[in-house]
Structures are given as C-alpha cells and as structure tokens.
Amino acid sequence: MLVFWLDILGTAVFAVSGVLLAGKLRMDPFGVLVLGVVTAVGGGTIRDMALANGPVFWVKDPTDLVVAMITCVLTLLLVRQPRRLPKWVLPVLDAVGLAVFVGIGVNKAFAAGTGPLVAICMGVITGVGGGIIRDVLAREIPMILRTEIYATACIIGGIVHATAFYTFGMPLQQAMMLGMLISLAIRLAAIRWHLKLPAFILER
C-alpha cells in the first residue's frame, strides 16, 4: 500500500513539473497535457520495455495514466501564471518525483528477478527517463546531461537501496525509503547550495 501511494505521489509530482515547464514555454493545452503525461510515465515505460516483463505498467493498470491526466488538468486550471512561481518550485517538485521513482524502479526490477546492478540501472532509468523525454520535447538540454548533480543522486540512492536489500537483508520497503531519502537529500542539497559536477571541457 505504501508503494502504491508513493507511486501516485511521484506520478502527480512529475506531471506537475511537466505542466509548469509547458507553461513557462507558453504551450497550448494539448502541449501541456503531452508534456505532463510523458514526464509522469516516460521513465517507467522505458523501464518496463527494458525488463520485457509483459505490457508496460500503465497498459496493465491505467491508474497512473489517469492520475497524470487529472493532475495536468487541475494544474492547468489552478496555476494560471506559472512564470510568477518561485524558481525553486519546479526543481524541488522534480527532486521529489525523482527520488520516489528511483525507489519504485529498483523495487520493480528486483520483483522481476534481476540482480542489484540491473536494479540500480532500472531505478535510474525510471527516475530520469520521463524528465529526459520532457526536456527533449521542450528543446532543452536534459538535466541528466548538465553539470547538475541529478543522475548522481539517482545512482547513489539506488546503490543504497539495492545494497540495503540485497546485501544486508533489509526489508524491501525499508530499503526503498532509505534509498529515496538519500536521493532526495542529495538532490535538494545540490539545489540549495548550487552543487555541480566538474564539466568536461576540450580547448580548441
């Protein structure tokens, strides 16, 4: 039950982040809906296709798809001036969704019978996949390709999650919560103190 509600939370939060970005780019309602939905379900879709574990999650159970659509519509109706929102709103919402989806991705990979390395990779894909699709559609450089500490937070949280469960035998839900908190703390710290990774620069 906890995983279900966390999944709903992550879906809604990522949908909101997609809608807010669409609003900043002055997209029409259809563009808003597309950007919000792909942000919410994109990462999980890539994960399920990679695991080849039957139909993707929103085909088997459209709950996440419905939640994403409803969230998009409500955000579109209630947030009339996204350009006036504080700059930290979108990054913080994205960080929450990121942490939740990394944990869910690791859990689903373990449920599919994978080892810890693949589980970590699936967690990262679940966390960043929707954001990559969102940024590509919005013609922005995906966050994962910038010097922001983004994928790093996913990887470390995924490692903590997988290690706690696979190596130390911690119950899966507890390991998930631990990994999520680590991912969220790292990402929020990076946002708060503008922490970045060094850039790779080649001089001409």
Language model regions located:
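Ordered, amphipathic secondary-structure segments that act as subunit-interaction surfaces
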Residues: 69-108
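Alpha-helical transmembrane segments in multi-pass membrane proteins
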Residues: 14, 35-43, 63, 67-71, ...
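Structural signature of hydrophobic alpha-helical transmembrane segments
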Residues: 1-11, 56-70, 115-127
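Helix-coil boundary and interhelical linker segments in multi-pass alpha-helical membrane proteins
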Residues: 1-5, 49-59, 105-118, 163-174
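Cytoplasmic-side transmembrane-helix entry/capping segments in multi-pass membrane proteins
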Residues: 30-38, 61-65, 86-97, 122, ...
